[in-house]
Each structure stands twice: as structure tokens, then as C-alpha cells.
UniProtKB/Swiss-Prot annotation:
Location(s) in or outside the cell: Cytoplasm
Top-level taxon of origin: Bacteria
Ligand binding (Mg(2+)): 239, 260
PANTHER family on file: TRNA MODIFICATION GTPASE GTPBP3, TRNA MODIFICATION GTPASE GTPBP3, MITOCHONDRIAL
Annotated residues for binding of GTP: 235-240, 254-260, 279-282
Cofactor annotation comment: Binds 1 potassium ion per subunit.
InterPro entries linked to this entry: G_TrmE, GTP-bd, GTP-bd_TrmE_N, GTPase_MnmE, MnmE_dom2, MnmE_helical, P-loop_NTPase, Small_GTP-bd
Binding-site residues for (6S)-5-formyl-5,6,7,8-tetrahydrofolate, renumbered to this chain: 27, 89, 128, 464
Protein name: tRNA modification GTPase MnmE
Species assigned in the record: Pediococcus pentosaceus (strain ATCC 25745 / CCUG 21536 / LMG 10740 / 183-1w)
GO CC aspect terms: cytosol
PROSITE patterns on file: G_TRME
Cofactor(s) the protein needs: K(+)
Biological role stated in the UniProt entry: Exhibits a very high intrinsic GTPase hydrolysis rate. Involved in the addition of a carboxymethylaminomethyl (cmnm) group at the wobble position (U34) of certain tRNAs, forming tRNA-cmnm(5)s(2)U34.
């Protein structure tokens, strides 16, 4: 990671969401940030105020001297800022007109409009954070539960960075020792000694990488949410289950079969587990072209689901479509909900037990929250019981890019161990150890391609 600041041009952007609100914030960063802000600010001389202070004044249109807005202006001087550059943040009244007017005045002076994520990109390029920490900023913004926020904060604080840096240093130390042993052999069995040194370090690093990878499944759930498909025959109460989990009415509920003809997606926090709930159209044979499209989309949602909530109508006997869905989801993470339990039970429970264990079954009612708490408890119990089960000293891997690089590093270490076992020359085995070092460096951004930065930071919003 770079540690020396690079001088860039001055950038500006609105950092708050568009629309009406109490305040809006326009952020300026760069060598001319103070100069630019001073040209449009009436109040204390910003060039003379202390760093990390907030100052009351007004924004003035420099072309005509007219007052634009009453503002509070924060001044933060390099290097102790988010970007390690001078930063000025203008807090104006919320709303589109005033905010955009101030931004346009700034862009007419010594600043240009920032690209998405450019402030965070500068924080990385100027050495304040590494690449994994930069990615954690986006994870923090997108966090859907307290636990996903905690994991993102831990990564932003550098927990993952420190572990990866230590692993790379351990590898570098052993590579240096290998080079010394090869170039200046003091003993006849130097090849054997060096191979043993490489093997011990490869086993040690591999164990720590596998510890990290063991958290990947839970990490993906926390970061991206658990893709949860609510499926079943038309009019079994799928939309009611969705609404009960959301604790509000999002889906249309009627007694008409086929009311849901499309896929409805909503996020909900279930005891710390972020669910991406997908309420699907009823899966059944149909000649209706529009309804058939909905059924096809339902099957696609089912194929992509991490968890399936299969809803059955307990007030009618099992249908052939029910049996098909029970068979189809048998090897998936599944909860079976017997809905309409407030009505007379006509489903054959003995037959149902041929397809599903009792522990998978939850009884519920479409007209009341009956069974909702049981369903939430079951979901939480299936996925780490609402707490972060962690085997890597509170470090969890959540990012698909990091997971992929760790898997590649693990494979490279397999090659190291295989090479040693087969008697491959140490200088050749060393190549795979060096590759492991490089791959781990890609996680923190010690080595990267410009295209990767463009791809990562383009996912950020303007002003961050």
C-alpha cells in the first residue's frame, strides 16, 4: 500500500442523498479545496481557521455577490482527513435547488465533479486505507443488520488487513531465508533443511487461510443477505407469510388464486440474519401466458435460493404439485410452513412425513401472526442463531473477491506442499510460495490493476 500522498486535482460532489432534507453536504477535496471554498464563503477567513472546526457563514455567488444560502462550513487540513488532502464540507439547507446551486458555483471555479467513489479511491491511493478497508466502506453503507455493520466496521478498522499483512510478512521472511540458504549454503543438507522450512511455513499459512475461508458462507449471508424463496401452489398464503415476516403489508393478499404474478423482493432482518425475501408466483401448470412467465421466474428464484420456505395449505389434501415441490427441495435448506392452521386440517400428516422431518415444519395462519415467531426462530437457528460464529479471532471474510483470492492462495500452497513431497527443487517450489504472497497482496491492494480500481470504486455513490 502506498504511504506517500499523491497530488491530485480538486474534486467536489454532494455527499448526501438527493431530495428534501434537513441539510445537504457538499464535499470538496484537493490541493485547492480551501482556495475554492474561500472564494464563495462569507464569514471567517477559512485559510486562517483551525483545522477540524466548523464555521458559520453564507455562500455567495462570486459573479454577482448575491447570497445563496446560510451554511456551516467544516475545514479539515491534510493529512488528517478522509482523503489525506485538504477537505472542506459545506453544510447547507437540504433540498435540490440550493444544494445544486452551490455545487455548480464550486464547479465553475477550481474544482471538477468527483467520480463515484473518488474520495475513497484517494484515501486508498494516498495510503490512509488499504483496498480491503476501502471495500469495507461500501459494505458499511449497504449493511442491513447490526451484525453485518459490525463485520464491516471490523474490516474498516483493519482487522483483516493486519492478518493478511502478517501472513505476507511470514511468507516473505521464509522466502528470504530460502534465498540465503540457496545462495550461501553452509551445510551439505541445505536442500532438505530449506524444503522443511518451506513446508512448515506453508502448513502454518494454509491453516490460517482455511480458518478465514471457513467463515465465507456466513460472511456472504451477512454481506449480501440470505436469498430466501417463498414458494408453493397458488393461494396457499405465500404473500401472507411475506407480510408477517416484514411486519407490514407489502404483497397483495386475496382469496383469488394467482394474485401474485411476478416476483416480489424485500429485505428483512430476522434476529440478525439479513433475508432477501422473494415472494414468488404460485408454481403450477398453467396455459395463461402472463401467469406462465411468473411461474418461470419463480422456478428461477427457487434455483438461486439459499433458503426455501415451502408453503403448504393444511386445509386441503396434498396436491401433485406439492409433492413435486417437496421432492425438488429435499436437498435444499428448507422450512415447510403449514399455512391456514386456523382451519380444519385436511392434509395427510403421515404422508407429509414421508417427505419432510417434523423439525422442518412450522404451523401458521394467514389471518394472524400465528407461527411467525417460530418461523423466525427456525431461520435464526439454521443460520448461526443470530450471532456471528467466528473461528478466526473475530475476523470474517464477506467479500467474494477476497474469498476467490484466498482460495487461489490455498491452491498455491497445495502446490508448494506437493512439490516438496515429490522432491521438486526448492527454487521451483519457491515460485508457488511467491505466488501465495502475491495473491494475498491483491486483497489489501499491495498489488493491483487500474481496471480493478475502476471496477470497485464505480460501485460507490457520488460524494463517497
Amino acid at each position: 500500500m502506498q504511504t506517500v500522498s499523491t497530488e491530485f486535482d480538486t474534486i467536489a460532489a454532494i455527499s448526501t442523498p438527493p431530495g428534501e432534507g434537513g441539510i445537504s453536504i457538499i464535499r470538496i477535496s484537493g490541493v485547492d479545496a480551501l482556495k475554492t471554498a474561500s472564494q464563495i464563503y462569507r464569514g471567517k477567513d477559512l485559510n486562517k481557521v483551525n483545522s477540524h472546526t466548523i464555521n458559520y457563514g453564507h455562500i455567495i455567488d462570486p459573479e454577482n455577490g448575491n447570497e445563496v444560502d446560510e451554511v456551516m462550513v467544516s475545514v479539515m487540513r491534510a493529512p488528517h482527513t478522509y482523503t489525506k488532502e485538504d477537505i472542506v464540507e459545506i453544510n447547507c439547507h437540504g433540498g435540490i435547488v440550493a444544494t445544486n446551486r452551490i455545487l455548480q458555483i464550486i464547479l465553475g471555479l477550481d474544482a471538477r465533479l468527483a467520480k463515484p467513489g473518488e474520495f475513497t479511491e484517494r484515501a486508498f491511493l494516498n495510503g490512509r486505507i488499504d483496498l480491503s478497508q476501502a471495500e469495507a466502506v461500501m459494505d458499511l453503507i449497504r449493511a442491513k443488520t447490526d451484525q453485518s455493520m459490525k463485520v464491516a466496521l471490523d474490516q474498516l478498522d483493519g482487522n483483516l488487513s493486519h492478518l493478511i499483512t502478517n501472513l505476507r510478512q511470514n511468507i516473505l521472511d521464509v522466502l528470504a531465508q530460502v534465498e540465503v540458504n540457496i545462495d550461501y549454503p553452509e551445510y551439505d543438507d541445505v536442500e532438505t533443511m530449506t524444503a522443511r522450512l518451506l513446508k512448515e511455513k506453508a502448513i502454518e499459512v494454509k491453516a490460517k487461510i482455511q480458518q478465514l475461508l471457513s467463515t465465507a458462507k456466513q460472511g456472504k449471508v451477512l454481506r449480501d443477505g440470505l436469498a430466501t424463496a417463498i414458494i408453493g401452489h397458488p393461494n396457499v398464503g405465500k404473500s401472507s407469510i411475506l407480510n408477517h415476516l416484514l411486519h407490514e403489508d407489502k404483497a397483495i393478499v386475496t382469496d383469488v388464486a394467482g394474485t401474485t404474478r411476478d416476483v416480489i423482493e424485500e429485505y428483512v432482518n430476522v434476529q440478525g440474519v439479513p433475508l432477501k425475501l422473494v415472494d414468488t408466483a404460485g408454481i403450477h401448470e398453467t396455459e395463461d401466458k402472463v401467469e406462465k412467465i411468473g411461474v418461470d421466474r419463480s422456478r428461477k428464484a427457487l434455483s438461486q435460493a439459499d433458503l426455501v420456505i415451502l408453503v403448504l395449505d393444511s386445509s386441503v389434501p396434498l396436491r401433485d404439485e406439492d409433492r413435486e415441490l417437496l421432492r425438488e427441495t429435499n436437498h435444499m435448506q428448507r422450512i415447510v410452513v403449514l399455512n391456514k392452521s386456523d382451519l380444519e386440517v385436511k392434509i395427510n400428516l403421515n404422508e407429509l412425513q414421508e417427505y419432510v422431518d417434523d423439525k422442518e415444519i412450522i404451523k401458521s395462519s394467514a389471518v394472524s401472526p400465528l407461527g411467525t415467531k417460530d418461523l423466525e426462530d427456525r431461520i435464526a437457528a439454521m443460520f448461526f442463531a443470530g450471532s456471528i460464529e467466528n473461528t478466526s479471532n473475530n475476523i470474517m471474510v464477506t467479500n467474494a473477491r477476497h474469498i476467490g483470492l484466498l482460495k487461489q492462495a490455498d491452491t498455491a500452497l497445495d502446490a508448494v506442499l506437493e512439490g516438496i513431497e515429490t522432491g521438486m527443487p526448492v527454487d521451483l517450489v519457491q515460485i508457488d510460495m511467491t505466488r501465495t504472497w502475491d495473491l494475498l497482496g491483491e486483497i489489501t491492494g499491495d498489488s493491483y490493476q487500474d481496471e480493478l480500481l475502476d471496477q470497485l470504486f464505480s460501485q460507490f455513490c457520488l460524494g463517497k
